[in-house]
């Protein structure tokens, strides 16, 4: 489980140290292999096993389903396998850093089954734009059984 948020930095070589708490979560059954994929304003980081499960669900859709093809072209095709180095870092390719605006200061946020890496400034803007009472959200989620 990935919970919480952590301030970190991307070094000039594009390496990012994964928080110890998240490394522990990966070690509990997931190992040191992850899948990274840029999505919107963030870089998603998925445990390899959970990514494989996602791919299987997508592959379970009819072969010519337009949604299947779109998610394969626009999302899955961008995914890249990455292994944590002995210091617990991942290497983020330059084009991925550019795509989601990762320069130096980042926020790593846990989203239960995955985590995301955000440029700190973009995250602050996102938070401001989505700030407010959560009562309506919690009510909608309760209606969905959460």
Question: Residue spans of the language-model regions?
Answer:
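Short, charged/polar, Gly/Pro-enriched secondary-structure boundary elements
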Residues: 52-54, 123-127
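Acidic/histidine-enriched, glycine/proline-rich intrinsically disordered or flexible terminal extensions
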Residues: 130-146
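Short, charged/polar surface micro-motifs in flexible loops or helix N-caps
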Residues: 41-43, 50-53
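A positional/architectural concept
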Residues: 2-43
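Short, solvent-exposed interaction modules
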Residues: 53, 59-90, 94-97
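A short beta-strand-loop micro-motif that forms or neighbors metal/cofactor-
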Residues: 28-43, 79, 101-118, 135
């Amino acid at each position: 489980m990935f919970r919480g948020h952590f301030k970190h930095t991307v070094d000039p070589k594009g390496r990012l140290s994964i928080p110890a708490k998240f490394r522990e979560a990966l070690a509990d059954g997931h190992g040191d292999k992850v899948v990274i994929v840029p999505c919107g304003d963030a870089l998603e980081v998925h445990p390899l096993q959970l990514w494989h499960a996602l791919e299987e669900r997508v592959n379970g859709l009819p072969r010519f389903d337009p949604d299947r093809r779109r998610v394969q072209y626009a999302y899955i095709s961008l995914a890249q396998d990455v292994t944590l180095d002995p210091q617990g870092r991942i290497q983020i390719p330059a084009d991925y850093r550019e795509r989601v605006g990762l320069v130096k200061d980042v926020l790593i946020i846990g989203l239960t089954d995955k985590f995301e890496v955000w440029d700190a400034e973009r995250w602050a803007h996102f938070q401001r734009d989505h700030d407010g009472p959560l009562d309506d959200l919690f009510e909608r989620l309760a209606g969905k059984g959460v």
